[in-house]
């Protein structure tokens, strides 16, 4: 039988956004290295992450590489050498419209292997509301009356598929897709 190892921290934990306290993880580390801060914190919790994101202070993930505007590998190494454990949210349930997965959905539509990564609004609410002239289901009032929405209106993003149809997707962060402008000459070229 394998021995299970657990580690439970008993020291103080610093919580901060990566762009706070000077704007970068390097600046936060500089603060932690000051003599009066030495050994003050055992853990550092970055809210929510230091990944490449484009909205909502880090919850709209483009990809899971380090956002070099906030942190580099040398910063992570410095925390390790200081004996400070880094903690962060691993955000798997929010993806940016700029993520490779969403871009694949835009280019391949229903043929995208990532189509089920995103919630098709109409499939989700099918049988529980009425279709609007705009092409999305307006859920029955009793189903959404108690729901919290971050902004007025329904969180819907109409996504243009490769065949020209528009499909509504759940859009928690109220993102927008910036489609390239059409040149009328492109429509007549073969």
Task: For every predicted segment, state its role.
Residues 3-189:
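Acidic/aromatic-lined carbohydrate-recognition and catalytic surfaces
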């Amino acid at each position: 039988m394998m021995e299970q190892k657990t580690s439970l921290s008993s020291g103080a934990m610093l919580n901060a956004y990566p762009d706070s306290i000077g704007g970068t993880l390097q600046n936060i580390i500089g603060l932690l290295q000051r003599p009066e801060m030495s050994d003050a914190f055992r853990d550092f919790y970055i809210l929510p992450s230091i990944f490449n994101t484009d909205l909502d202070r880090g919850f709209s993930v483009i990809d899971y590489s380090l956002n070099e505007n906030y942190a580099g590998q040398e910063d992570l190494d410095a925390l390790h050498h200081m004996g400070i454990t880094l903690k962060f949210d691993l955000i798997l349930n929010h993806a940016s419209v700029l993520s490779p997965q969403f871009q694949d959905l835009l280019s391949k539509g229903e043929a995208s292997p990532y189509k089920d990564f995103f919630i098709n609004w109409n499939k989700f609410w099918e049988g529980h509301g009425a279709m609007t002239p705009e092409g999305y289901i307006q859920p029955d009032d009793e189903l959404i009356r108690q729901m919290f929405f971050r902004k007025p209106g329904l969180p819907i993003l109409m996504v243009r598929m490769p065949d020209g149809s528009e499909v509504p997707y759940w859009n928690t962060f109220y993102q927008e897709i910036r489609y390239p402008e059409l040149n009328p000459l492109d429509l007549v070229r073969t």
